[in-house]
A protein has these predicted regions:
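Cross-family detector of peptidyl-prolyl cis-trans isomerase
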Residues: 2-5, 24-182
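Bacterial N-terminal signal peptides that target proteins for export
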Residues: 2-14
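Bacterial N-terminal signal peptides
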Residues: 15-23
Length: 182
C-alpha cells in the first residue's frame, strides 16, 4: 500500500507540474503580430524617407536617408562642432514614441553616457551625420532598439516598450563631451 501511495503521489505531483507548465507557458505573450506590424510600418516609412532624400527642395529638413543597418532618419539641423564617440557623454532633449503614437519617454537636457543608450542612438550619434546642436528624428528597427525582449516597467509585469518595437525618437543634441575611453 505504501508503494501504491507513493506512486499515486508522484503521478499527482507530475500532473500538477505539467498543468502549471502549460498554464504559465500560455501566459507568455505572443508578439509575432506586433513584430510583423512594426516591420511592415518601417518598410512603408522607407518609401517616405526615400522620397525625402531624393527631393530637390528640402522644406524643414536638411537631409533624410537610411543607414546600412536600416535606421531611417530625417535631420532638421545637422548641428555644429563635435561629433560624439562611443566613449562620449551627451546632453539631449528627446521624445520617444512607438509606431502607434504611444509616448514611451521624454526628457529635457538629459545627461547620458553613450554606452547606456540603445544601439540605434549610439550608431546615429557617432555616425558623423549629426553634431552638437543637431535636431533630428530617427526610426530605429527593433533589433537596434529594445530587441526581442522589450523594456519592462521597473517592478511591474507590463511592457514599457514591447518586444519587436520600432522606436521613433525626436532628438536635439544639446552638448557632447568626448572623454577618453577607459
Amino acid at each position: 500500500m505504501t508503494h501504491t501511495y507513493r506512486t499515486a503521489t508522484k503521478r499527482y505531483l507530475l500532473a500538477i507540474l505539467l498543468a502549471s507548465a502549460a498554464i504559465f507557458s500560455s501566459c507568455r505573450e505572443d508578439f509575432s503580430v506586433w513584430k510583423a506590424h512594426n516591420e511592415a510600418w518601417l518598410n512603408k516609412n522607407k518609401t517616405t524617407i526615400d522620397s525625402l532624400s531624393k527631393a530637390e527642395v528640402k522644406n524643414d529638413y536638411v537631409a533624410a536617408g537610411i543607414t546600412p543597418s536600416g535606421i531611417q532618419y530625417v535631420i532638421r539641423h545637422s548641428g555644429y562642432g563635435i561629433v560624439a564617440k562611443r566613449s562620449s557623454a551627451v546632453n539631449v532633449t528627446y521624445q520617444n514614441f512607438l509606431i502607434d503614437g504611444t509616448a514611451v519617454g521624454h526628457a529635457e537636457k538629459y545627461d547620458v553616457q553613450m554606452k547606456d543608450m540603445v544601439e540605434g542612438w549610439q550608431e546615429i550619434l557617432c555616425s558623423g551625420l549629426v553634431r552638437q546642436g543637431a535636431n533630428f528624428t530617427i526610426y530605429i528597427p527593433w533589433n537596434l532598439a529594445y530587441g526581442k525582449t522589450g523594456n519592462k516597467v521597473a517592478s511591474a509585469a507590463r511592457f514599457f516598450v514591447p518586444p519587436y518595437s520600432t522606436f521613433i525618437s525626436h532628438i536635439e543634441i544639446v552638448k557632447i563631451v568626448n572623454t577618453l575611453p577607459k
